[in-house]
From Swiss-Prot:
<dbReference type="GO" id="GO:0070475">
    <property type="term" value="P:rRNA base methylation"/>
</dbReference>
<comment type="function">
    <text>Specifically methylates the N4 position of cytidine in position 1402 (C1402) of 16S rRNA.</text>
</comment>
<comment type="similarity">
    <text>Belongs to the methyltransferase superfamily. RsmH family.</text>
</comment>
<keyword id="KW-0963">Cytoplasm</keyword>
<feature type="binding site">
    <location>
        <position position="83"/>
    </location>
    <ligand>
        <name>S-adenosyl-L-methionine</name>
    </ligand>
</feature>
<dbReference type="GO" id="GO:0005737">
    <property type="term" value="C:cytoplasm"/>
</dbReference>
<feature type="binding site">
    <location>
        <position position="57"/>
    </location>
    <ligand>
        <name>S-adenosyl-L-methionine</name>
    </ligand>
</feature>
<dbReference type="GO" id="GO:0071424">
    <property type="term" value="F:rRNA (cytosine-N4-)-methyltransferase activity"/>
</dbReference>
<keyword id="KW-0489">Methyltransferase</keyword>
<dbReference type="InterPro" id="IPR029063">
    <property type="entry name" value="SAM-dependent_MTases_sf"/>
</dbReference>
<dbReference type="Pfam" id="PF01795">
    <property type="entry name" value="Methyltransf_5"/>
</dbReference>
<dbReference type="InterPro" id="IPR023397">
    <property type="entry name" value="SAM-dep_MeTrfase_MraW_recog"/>
</dbReference>
<protein>
    <recommendedName>
        <fullName>Ribosomal RNA small subunit methyltransferase H</fullName>
        <ecNumber>2.1.1.199</ecNumber>
    </recommendedName>
</protein>
<keyword id="KW-0949">S-adenosyl-L-methionine</keyword>
<feature type="binding site">
    <location>
        <begin position="37"/>
        <end position="39"/>
    </location>
    <ligand>
        <name>S-adenosyl-L-methionine</name>
    </ligand>
</feature>
<keyword id="KW-0698">rRNA processing</keyword>
<feature type="binding site">
    <location>
        <position position="111"/>
    </location>
    <ligand>
        <name>S-adenosyl-L-methionine</name>
    </ligand>
</feature>
Length: 313
């Protein structure tokens, strides 16, 4: 638990992350979405002084907060950048291998609670949704600059919405007249979705906001690019722990982890012999929060933890 701006924030699946990530107390660990430091602060307290923790975040406010939070530790480095640029930074730091890497793919509680960031469909603010505030295109500009067909594709691919056409047309018409704020967008969505979506258990705007956020931040593309090379940096026994929050992230992580867990360390051919495998996929279906955590932190309800371990060089 952490207090940020008088709000209580809980690192999701913290116990499970610590149990599955830390393999050696004097190793090199990465937190590629350090956010406001909830996971990493608990991790660094367990590690030895010889260990090293490197945290990435594209949100400058998160890095500023972490600079204060970790000021007592001289073995923590913080980098304000998207994790898609990890390889460049590891080369600059002359790091060839790591012992563990955490990636929490969720929007931080702090970002959701800041109405002006535009991530929440419960709060009044500009429809922004940029993780990196220096990016030129936010969600408002994305709607303004995209065609109806482009927006329909975004909603289908990133929101998994079967028929977003009516909502998209209404959005385009509305934004041609003026910029709508988050709550105005929510009302527009409610007005144009079908009754099944309107009265479903989950908020009717949830998938539309998700689709816009993913598109604005290129979330799936950067995740796929990262996972194409990240596992090769692991030392033997090292682990990658990824927390997903929706099925699109989950599909990417599952596909990569399952593929790597089927490859032989000898010749990169598929093999069933566990002794010859290069990687081990710990949780095929992902590890979900306990009932106790769900009762304490509602935002953890869709979280799943996936862990890949390098078992042979």
């Amino acid at each position: 638990m952490m207090i940020i701006n008088n709000q209580i924030h809980y690192p999701v699946l913290l116990k499970e992350v610590i149990e599955n990530l830390i393999t050696t107390k004097d190793g090199i660990y990465l937190d590629l979405t350090i956010g406001f430091g909830g996971h990493s602060y608990n991790i660094i307290k367990i590690l030895d002084q010889k260990a090293r923790l490197i945290g990435f975040d594209q949100d400058l406010k998160a890095i500023a907060h972490c600079n204060q939070l970790f000021s007592e530790f001289n073995n923590v480095s913080l980098i304000n950048d998207n994790f898609v640029n990890l390889k460049k930074h590891l080369q600059l730091m002359q790091i060839d291998n790591i012992d563990g890497c955490l990636i929490d793919l969720g929007v931080s509680s702090y970002q959701l609670d800041q109405a002006d960031r535009g991530f929440s469909y419960h709060s009044l603010g500009r429809l922004d949704m940029r993780m990196d505030q220096n990016k030129a295109v936010d969600a408002t500009k994305l709607i303004q600059n995209s065609t109806v067909s482009e927006l329909v594709k975004i909603m289908k691919n990133y929101g998994e919405i079967k028929d977003p056409y009516r909502v998209v047309v209404a959005l385009k018409k509305a934004f041609e007249k003026k910029e709508l704020n988050t709550l105005e967008v929510v009302e527009l969505i409610k007005k144009h979705v079908n009754k099944a979506e309107l009265y479903a258990n989950k908020h009717p705007a949830r998938r539309y906001f998700q689709a816009l956020r993913i598109a604005v931040n290129n979330e799936l593309e950067v995740l796929e690019k990262l996972l194409s090379y990240l596992p090769s940096y692991l030392n033997k026994g090292g682990k990658i722990a990824i927390i997903t929050f929706h099925s699109l992230e989950e599909k990417i992580v599952k596909k990569v982890f399952r593929h790597l867990a089927s490859i032989s360390s000898l010749n990169n051919l598929p093999i069933n012999n566990e002794l010859l495998k290069k990687y081990h996929n710990h949780f095929n279906k992902g590890l979900s929060p306990t009932q106790s955590e769900l009762e304490t932190n509602r935002r953890s309800r869709s979280a799943k933890l996936f862990v890949l371990e390098k078992i042979n060089n």
